[in-house]
């Protein structure tokens, strides 16, 4: 019995060679449109799809394979006489292999000048239908959606005259994943077009980026996936210039670091991070001095940490960083000399480059947090704040230097794990108190870390003070300026305590919990 393959592909990589090998094995080839032209031009004899259907391609190719002669040939069960008799009675030829990939919908909508009409025209209808029909009948039909699978199919056909059931089942599973992702991407596009922010169904499409050695701990299996529509300013899209593959924890920490530095666009800034918390932030008129401040913030914790810089890394800065053990360095660019310094004798140092000019576009993405049996979705904490909207609630107003320091501290506290406290001056962090289960413990931790550098320091809290004991601790340490959201039923007690000790305190009206 003659074996038949239907080939209709938009990605023609390797298809001529694949078809030529099938011909050598005695297969009859049915093809459509541009695929048929490509195969015919290569000297591969094919049968036109309309010779199979008895119906011409029409409506600019929208209707060509949606026909019983095609889907009957794909769906007929070879183990049921009734199916085979129905095929024979209706002159339906059986199809044993389907090779289809879909209209480039993703590539189309990624074009900067794409129109809605272009997007709609690149929604494939016939292709997914054939793939699904063939995949459903994988007991008898082999279906190929990925050119990477051509070789294994040819190997099995050459060796055995047919593919194994295990291969057909695996390829069918791949097809259903592929068509599901294709439809999900179309749904995502249309959902955005109509402005629907809370769809009743949520399907996310990601592609495998990296198979990881392990997850957060060695006993945890893990992989890294990238959005089907990539975000330019993201670790998934970063260009790695040196070093080993990123680990699971590297990726989470690096993501936290590039989020933090988005809030420090106005001046050269360096952020050092460890275990999802900033351990040093420095800001200056040049990137080398900003590094100095970030390093001096906490020379101990930065060891084995991640550093992100928002300006090009020059040789002088690279020379200083070279002397510190770091896991990852991230920057918009590096001078050739700086890169040579960093790579020298540090073959494992992971060096990444990111397009910092794409930061704003990354801020509009939703955040997803998995919980057992569910998924939490929220927009990112990127609310635009202005000191003009803040309220000084104490009798004493901040000095100009304090006001600058408070603004710096308020940017920095946003990414400290709750309950979060941070102590800074106007250009660097001095002490961080993250993740304590009561706020006064976080206050003590941050103050203890800042120690003898508290002269002129200010303190920021990610949420309100529930009791005045926090202010008492702050005043006792000698800190004279506080910034916090306010909003406690006991705010007045904290205000009175601040006035008692001559402190200035600013309420922002915006909470920045981070869990």
Curated annotation (Swiss-Prot):
Pathway: Purine metabolism; IMP biosynthesis via de novo pathway; 5-formamido-1-(5-phospho-D-ribosyl)imidazole-4-carboxamide from 5-amino-1-(5-phospho-D-ribosyl)imidazole-4-carboxamide (10-formyl THF route): step 1/1; Purine metabolism; IMP biosynthesis via de novo pathway; IMP from 5-formamido-1-(5-phospho-D-ribosyl)imidazole-4-carboxamide: step 1/1
Keywords, sorted A to Z: Hydrolase, Multifunctional enzyme, Purine biosynthesis, Transferase
Recorded catalytic activity of this chain's protein: (6R)-10-formyltetrahydrofolate + 5-amino-1-(5-phospho-beta-D-ribosyl)imidazole-4-carboxamide = 5-formamido-1-(5-phospho-D-ribosyl)imidazole-4-carboxamide + (6S)-5,6,7,8-tetrahydrofolate; IMP + H2O = 5-formamido-1-(5-phospho-D-ribosyl)imidazole-4-carboxamide
Gene3D superfamilies (alphabetical): 3.40.140.20, Methylglyoxal synthase-like domain
A Gene Ontology BP annotation from the UniProt entry: 'de novo' IMP biosynthetic process
GO CC annotation, single: cytosol
Domain MGS-like: 1-145
EC number: 2.1.2.3, 3.5.4.10
Domain remark in the UniProt entry: The IMP cyclohydrolase activity resides in the N-terminal region.
Similarity section: Belongs to the PurH family.
Name the record gives this protein: Bifunctional purine biosynthesis protein PurH
Species name: Streptococcus pneumoniae serotype 19F (strain G54)
Gene: purH
């Amino acid at each position: 019995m003659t074996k038949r393959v239907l080939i209709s592909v938009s990605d023609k990589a390797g298809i001529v060679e694949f078809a030529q090998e099938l011909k050598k094995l005695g297969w009859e080839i049915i093809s459509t449109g541009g695929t048929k032209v490509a195969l015919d031009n290569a000297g591969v004899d094919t049968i036109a799809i309309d010779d199979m259907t008895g119906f011409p391609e029409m409506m600019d190719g929208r209707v060509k394979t949606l026909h019983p002669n095609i889907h009957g040939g794909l769906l007929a069960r070879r183990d049921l006489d009734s199916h085979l008799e129905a095929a024979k009675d209706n002159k339906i030829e059986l199809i044993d292999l389907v090779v289809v990939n879909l209209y480039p919908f993703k590539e189309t909508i990624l074009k900067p000048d794409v129109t809605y009409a272009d997007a709609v025209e690149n929604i494939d209808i016939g292709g997914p239908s054939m793939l699904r029909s063939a995949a459903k009948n994988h007991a008898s039909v082999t279906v190929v959606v990925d050119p990477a699978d051509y070789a294994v199919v040819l190997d099995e056909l050459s060796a055995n005259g047919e593919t194994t059931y295990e291969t057909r089942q695996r390829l069918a599973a791949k097809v259903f994943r592929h068509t599901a992702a294709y439809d999900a991407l179309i749904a995502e596009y249309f959902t955005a077009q109509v402005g629907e922010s809370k769809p009743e169904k949520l399907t996310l499409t990601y592609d495998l980026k990296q198979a990881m050695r392990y997850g957060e701990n060695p006993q945890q299996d893990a992989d890294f996936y990238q959005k089907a529509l990539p975000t330019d300013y993201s670790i998934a899209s970063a260009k790695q210039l040196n070093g080993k593959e990123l680990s699971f924890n590297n990726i989470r920490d690096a993501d936290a670091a590039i989020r933090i530095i988005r809030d420090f666009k106005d001046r050269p800034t360096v952020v050092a991070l460890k275990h999802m918390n900033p351990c040093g932030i420095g800001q200056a008129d040049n990137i080398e001095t900003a590094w100095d401040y970030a390093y001096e913030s906490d020379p101990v914790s930065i060891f084995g940490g991640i550093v992100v810089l928002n300006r090009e890394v020059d040789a002088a800065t690279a020379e200083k960083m070279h002397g510190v053990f770091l896991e990852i360095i991230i920057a918009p660019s590096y001078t050739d000399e700086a890169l040579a310094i960093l790579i020298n004798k540090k073959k494992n140092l992971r060096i990444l480059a990111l397009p910092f000019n794409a930061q704003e576009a990354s801020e509009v993405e939703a955040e997803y947090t998995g919980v057992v049996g569910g998924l939490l979705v929220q927009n990112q904490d990127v609310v635009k704040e202005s000191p003009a909207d803040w309220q000084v609630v104490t009798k004493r107003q901040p000095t100009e230097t304090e006001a600058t320091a408070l603004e710096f501290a308020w940017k920095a506290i946003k990414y400290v794990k709750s309950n979060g406290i941070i102590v800074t001056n106007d250009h660097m962090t001095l002490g961080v108190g993250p993740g304590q289960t009561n706020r006064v413990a976080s206050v003590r931790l941050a103050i203890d870390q800042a120690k003898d550098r508290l002269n002129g320091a200010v303190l920021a809290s990610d949420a309100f003070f529930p009791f005045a004991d926090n202010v008492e601790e702050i005043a006792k340490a000698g800190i004279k300026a506080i910034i916090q959201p306010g909003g406690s039923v006991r705010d007045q007690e904290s205000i009175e305590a601040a006035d008692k000790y001559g402190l200035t305190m600013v309420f922002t009206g915006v909470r920045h919990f981070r869990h």
